[in-house]
């Protein structure tokens, strides 16, 4: 990591916990979609995961990491966390709740700890990539 690079909450926490990770900056590429980001970074699109924050009927919040090219099945997700139903968190509520903005939301370093579910497809990879806490930054790390 460059010494001049701004550290996000996610990068700070991973560093503090002494976890092995690598950052990938794609700011200059102009990439937006998961496929574009994967191409800009020379990575497999299936290894790119997006962070989705939801709210259950109970009012509890849940975080899901799903392959970036897929959509979250809200019915199945609700069943996994024991809720009758869940809905995606509104964009306007994301920053106050997590400390991150839409498009730069990392599952690591949120303001509070929320139950987090990672799609089982992640297990097939040695490492996966997800948002590093700002648009243009991905973190690559293992699940162990």
Can you say where each PLM-predicted feature lies in the sequence?
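Extended, low-hydrophobicity, polar/charged segments
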Residues: 1-144
């Amino acid at each position: 990591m460059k010494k001049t690079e701004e550290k996000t909450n996610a990068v700070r926490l991973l560093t503090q916990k002494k976890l092995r990770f690598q950052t990938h900056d794609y700011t200059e590429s102009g990439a937006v979609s998961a496929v574009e980001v994967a191409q800009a970074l020379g990575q497999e699109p299936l290894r790119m995961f997006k962070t989705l924050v939801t709210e259950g009927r109970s009012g509890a919040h849940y975080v899901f990491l799903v392959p970036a090219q897929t959509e979250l099945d809200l019915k199945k997700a609700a069943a996994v966390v024991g809720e009758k139903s869940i809905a995606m968190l509104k964009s306007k509520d994301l920053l106050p709740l997590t400390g991150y903005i839409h498009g730069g939301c990392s599952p690591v370093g949120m303001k509070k700890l929320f139950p987090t579910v990672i799609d089982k497809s992640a297990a097939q990879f040695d490492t996966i990539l997800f948002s590093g806490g700002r648009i243009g930054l991905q973190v690559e790390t293992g699940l162990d």
